[in-house]
Amino acid sequence: MKDVKKFIEIISKYEIPVLEDNPYGELRFKGESLPSLKSMDKKGLVIFLGTFSKILCPGYRLGWTCAYQNILKKFIFVKQVADLQASSISQIEVSKFIDLYNLDNHVKK
């Protein structure tokens, strides 16, 4: 953990953006999940990527990004150029699941 804190200090000092791809961050066989880099980032330098394919349904290929708005706008543009959009049905199903059930409790199962 000490090394991670030092890493955050360095990227903060030099304002280096970091992409944290964390598909397995919520999955643990025992103990608490480890904190993400994003949770320790005070300057908004860490761009966090997550996926529903590991915690809900492997076939969905549906994820999310946590970043500042100016970065998200660029991500959206690149995504639209690359593949237009993810499956609308998958997006609706995941949205309904999140609305109806506690996603954190589902992940703990």
Where are the regions a protein language model picked out?
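Active-site pre-lysine segment of PLP-dependent enzymes
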Residues: M1-E15, Y24-I55, Y68-Q69
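Conserved core segment of the aminotransferase class I/II
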Residues: K42-K108
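Glycine-centered flexible beta-alpha turn that most often forms the glycine-rich phosphate-binding loop
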Residues: D21
